[in-house]
């Protein structure tokens, strides 16, 4: 066997090893998401089943005066008699607190210049809710709007036995910008299709930073002390490690603004994907030990953590398709077909199937943009990487 053959063999094995975790995830979860489910009906329909159950909605906010009023009004339109909205105005230099109070929220002012990031604001809000005797908390981002059944669905799910919940999390109506439409499509796959599949299989749905909540017993057992740039993923891994399952509420949704600019989109991607790489380095050994010890419920979170970003996955599979190795080409074709099916299912679940299909024409440019960002994403995976807020569209 010549040196070229050896190199091709090593490259082929490496490509399979790094791309296989995501493919297994997509195959299992996309297939499961297509199965019918009646699990939520009991949780959502009983209008009086959650009487007396106190729910606090925590809204972390840093200089969100343009959007906080809309957010609070949206929450209070969803069964206002059963919820109290606590806005944590964290290191604000604008009128966020004034606008939140005007809309009907109670404001918790938190000014700690040495503490930045969403995790710090959430920790403060959760401590307040626990001290005041609330039965559960729900987190809504300041740039979001919620469905009118969200509060009732969350409360009933908690009363039905759920320890933690994640509502369906979408982007607000996609813009005419093709990259924005592709991001919305990727959002649908990651935040809707995959957790729906996990719910069908009885697995923990995941936490996506917006529209999630926990009972007070969970917070007392596992205080929210996650401080990474992806504190939601970090806390979910802590929940999984403790054997706590997050239920997925597909019928109740929260929708947030897409990044207003190219720089905002880049900042958001750096934070999310850099944070995921950091969690991969930190948690993979621990989850692997759990799996090897016979805890097979840790296998799916491990595969999820090892799964590459979809754009990078497609890029590597394209490389595999170009290599002169027959079995690897067959693998790449089958893998790309599976990804195509996943994308079609995500598009069908979204609000604009035709627009999503048109946006896919520009997918190669989106993939190149993601590959160009890899060095910045890797820098964002460092333990000392700062939490950088995504810029908002002030015209909303």
What are these regions (language model features)?
Residues 1-73:
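N-proximal low-complexity "stem/linker" segments adjacent to membrane-targeting elements
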Residues 73-82:
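Short, acidic, metal-binding catalytic loop of nucleotide-sugar glycosyltransferases
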């Amino acid at each position: 066997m010549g040196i070229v053959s050896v190199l091709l063999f090593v490259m082929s094995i490496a490509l399979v090893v790094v791309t296989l975790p995501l493919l297994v995830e997509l195959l299992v979860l996309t297939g499961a998401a297509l199965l019918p489910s009646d699990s939520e009906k009991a949780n959502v329909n009983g209008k009086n089943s959650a009487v007396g159950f106190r729910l606090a909605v925590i809204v972390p906010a840093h200089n969100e005066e343009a959007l906080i009023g809309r957010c609070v009004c949206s929450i209070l339109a969803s069964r206002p008699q059963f919820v109290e909205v606590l806005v944590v105005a964290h290191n604000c230099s604008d009128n966020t607190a004034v606008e939140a109070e005007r809309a009907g929220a109670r404001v918790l002012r938190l000014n700690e210049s040495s503490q930045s990031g969403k995790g710090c604001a959430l920790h403060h809000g959760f401590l307040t809710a626990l001290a005041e005797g609330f039965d559960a908390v729900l987190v809504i981002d300041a740039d979001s709007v919620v469905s009118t059944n969200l509060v009732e669905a969350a409360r009933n799910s908690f009363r039905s036995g759920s320890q933690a919940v994640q509502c369906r999390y979408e982007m607000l109506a996609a813009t005419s910008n093709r990259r924005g439409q592709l991001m919305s499509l990727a959002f649908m796959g990651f935040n809707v299709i995959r957790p729906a599949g996990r719910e069908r299989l009885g697995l923990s749905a995941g936490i996506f930073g917006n529209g999630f909540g926990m009972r007070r017993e969970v917070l007392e057992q596992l205080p929210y002390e996650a401080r990474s740039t992806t504190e939601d993923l970090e806390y979910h891994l802590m929940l999984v490690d403790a054997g706590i399952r997050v239920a997925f509420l597909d019928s109740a949704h929260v929708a947030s603004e897409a990044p207003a600019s190219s720089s905002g989109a880049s900042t958001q991607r750096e934070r999310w994907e850099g944070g995921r790489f950091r969690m991969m380095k930190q948690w993979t050994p621990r989850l692997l030990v759990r799996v090897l010890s016979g805890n097979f419920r840790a296998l799916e979170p491990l595969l999820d953590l090892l799964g590459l970003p979809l754009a990078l996955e497609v890029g590597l599979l394209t490389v595999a398709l170009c290599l002169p190795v027959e079995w690897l080409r067959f693998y790449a074709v089958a893998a790309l077909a599976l990804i195509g099916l996943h994308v079609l299912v995500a598009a069908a679940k979204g609000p604009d199937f035709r627009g999503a299909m048109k946006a896919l024409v520009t997918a190669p440019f989106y993939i190149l943009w993601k590959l160009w960002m890899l060095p910045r994403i890797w820098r964002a995976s460092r333990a000392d990487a700062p939490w950088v807020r995504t810029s908002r569209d002030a015209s909303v």
